[in-house]
Amino acid sequence: MLDATIDADVFRESVDAIAALVTECRLHATEQGLRTRTVDTANVAMISLELDKDVFESYQATSSEMGIDIVKIKNVLSMMGKGDPVHLALAEESRKLEVSFQSYQYSITLLDTNTIRKDPNAPTIELPGKVVISGAALSAAIKAASVVSDKIALGIDPEKGIFYMEAEGDTDHIRLELGDDKLISLVPVQARSLFSLDYLKDMGKTMSKAEKVEISLGIDHPVEFTFDIADGKGHVMYLLAPRIEAD
């Protein structure tokens, strides 16, 4: 069972965070809130999203699992105005999600969860390098790198005390170095990995709105981005596998 009301802007921000990686997901409702954890079809990236019940204007739920078509939900979101209260209700018998706002009442058929990949396990990998940066600065750097290449290196140079982002194309090159004066915080541990900008560009659109994003790095390891949404009552984690660097 689910019966909840949420601000349209918060709902949109949450759906956009998921849509950056996948077109469908298993959404779990509990007494504490909503959550999902899913990987993209290529097994390259993962998202974990949690919305505390305090995010909602009203919230009642029992343990439920829903198969959500993210594309359909985004289409419905396009009809919502800024700040509209959105009512969500799970019709258990018909397996439909009722979405109501303004004078509209949508009844969206849920996907069969048996056709959606099971939730992946939580990552346990050690990523000792830590950087905290504003979402706007991170997004801008990703955009800048995408002008010259389809991949970007993220790293930490502990001797210089900097976090750097570097991209190299066939003829062009860009490097951005950020020290303590440009970062919120830095744990200066040697780290460097190469990543696909195709994924990062989509993630960056969501992260651009975050006051701060924590980046966790290793050497030729995945990168983890964690940040809050909904005034700290919602939490997002992206995990992106590295690209193999050519010799």
Curated annotation (Swiss-Prot):
GO biological process terms, semicolon-separated: leading strand elongation; regulation of DNA replication
Signal peptide span: none
SUPFAM superfamilies xref list: DNA clamp
Keywords: DNA replication, DNA-binding
GO molecular function: DNA binding; DNA polymerase processivity factor activity
Gene3D superfamilies noted in UniProt: 3.70.10.10
Keyword Endoplasmic reticulum: no
UniProt-listed CDD domains: PCNA (cd00577)
Matching InterPro entries: DNA_clamp_sf, Pr_cel_nuc_antig, Pr_cel_nuc_antig_C, Pr_cel_nuc_antig_N
HAMAP family linked to this entry: DNApol_clamp_arch
Quaternary assembly: Homotrimer. The subunits circularize to form a toroid; DNA passes through its center. Replication factor C (RFC) is required to load the toroid on the DNA.
UniProt xrefs under NCBIfam families: PRK01115.1-5
Main function: Sliding clamp subunit that acts as a moving platform for DNA processing. Responsible for tethering the catalytic subunit of DNA polymerase and other proteins to DNA during high-speed replication.
Name assigned to this protein: DNA polymerase sliding clamp
Protein source organism: Methanosphaerula palustris (strain ATCC BAA-1556 / DSM 19958 / E1-9c)
